[in-house]
Structures are given as structure tokens and as C-alpha cells.
């Protein structure tokens, strides 16, 4: 059984380990690289968890971290779904669905009416997951990637209270 756990600042080693696993297993899925996170030590890992109003979740299977997702307050816009990843062993079992739903619940409780994300345009499995959850591509230009040409695909979902 998979359990979801909200990550606190004291859980920074857990967050570090799952983030490193995600970047090592799926470097094609993230804008940052594993090497980017080797600098800064504990202070850098804690800084990500100390963002005011942020919400970070880890999926645990038999006590092992097998997935992660985060919600970050928007900078003048809707909050953002960030850093979604599920380990290969846990894929296809609804872990990604549960992580996304948990961030959506967090956003609704914070009063948001929409949730935004940015995904690398070649990440077809992630795009399909997000579309299944009701996210749609926008015309908003995403951040420019390292190649200086490609931009992230920005997607948004209208949130409704049930």
C-alpha cells in the first residue's frame, strides 16, 4: 500500500534522496540536473522546503520513497504543481494520480481557482498524465531551456470545489 506523507523541513534528507533519485532516473523530465543539486548541502535542500506556503509530498511504499510532488504558491498567479515523479517500480499503480490530487487539494484549501504547471515538451508520459487530470496547454511561453530554443510547455487546470 502506498501512503502519502507531507514533507516538513526536518524531512530534508528524505526530500533530498527522492529528488536525487528522480533526477538520476529521469534526467529528461526535469529542467534542473542532478549535478546542480550537489552544491549547497543541507542549506540548499532546506531552502526548497522553507518556501512560505509550499506543500511537498512524498509517496511511500513499505516505507520506501517511490514518488514526489510539490505545490508552490504562484508569483501573482495560480499556484504551481512542481517536481512530479514516480519511481519505475511504482508506475502504473495510481501513485502519480494520488500525488496530483493531493496538490490539487492543497491548492483548493489555499483558495486557488486554478493550478499551473510547466513540463518539458518531449515528456509525453507526463503530458498524458496531466491531460488525464484535466490540465490543458496554454499559449503562455514557458521558460527557455538550456538549448536556447525550446521552451517548457505551460499547462493549467481550473479547480472546482466539490
Predicted regions and their residues:
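Extreme N-terminal starter segment of soluble prokaryotic enzymes
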Residues: 1-4
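Acetyl-CoA-dependent GNAT
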Residues: 6-89, 100-102, 106, 138-143, ...
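Flexible, glycine- and charge-enriched loops at secondary-structure boundaries
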Residues: 35, 93, 148
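Conserved glycine-rich acetyl-CoA-binding loop
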Residues: 64, 83, 87-101, 105-110, ...
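Short, flexible hinge/linker loops that cap or flank conserved catalytic cores
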Residues: 78, 109, 147-149
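Glycine-centered loop/turn positions within well-structured domains
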Residues: 79, 93, 153
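C-terminal "cap" of GNAT-fold acetyltransferases
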Residues: 113-116, 120-127, 131-162
Amino acid at each position: 500500500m502506498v501512503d502519502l506523507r507531507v514533507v516538513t523541513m526536518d524531512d530534508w534528507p528524505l526530500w533530498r534522496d527522492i529528488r536525487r533519485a528522480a533526477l538520476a532516473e529521469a534526467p529528461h523530465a526535469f529542467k534542473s540536473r542532478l549535478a546542480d543539486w550537489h552544491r549547497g548541502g543541507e542549506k540548499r535542500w532546506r531552502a526548497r522546503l522553507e518556501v512560505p506556503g509550499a506543500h511537498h509530498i512524498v509517496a511511500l511504499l513499505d516505507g520506501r520513497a517511490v514518488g514526489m510532488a510539490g505545490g508552490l504558491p504562484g508569483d501573482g498567479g495560480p499556484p504551481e504543481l512542481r517536481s512530479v515523479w514516480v519511481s519505475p517500480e511504482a508506475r502504473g499503480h495510481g501513485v502519480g494520480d494520488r500525488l496530483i490530487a493531493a496538490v490539487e487539494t492543497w491548492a483548493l484549501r489555499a483558495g486557488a481557482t486554478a493550478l499551473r504547471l510547466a513540463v518539458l515538451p518531449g515528456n509525453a508520459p507526463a503530458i498524458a498524465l496531466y491531460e488525464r487530470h484535466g490540465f490543458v496547454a496554454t499559449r503562455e511561453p514557458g521558460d527557455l531551456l538550456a538549448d536556447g530554443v525550446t521552451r517548457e510547455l505551460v499547462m493549467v487546470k481550473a479547480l472546482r470545489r466539490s
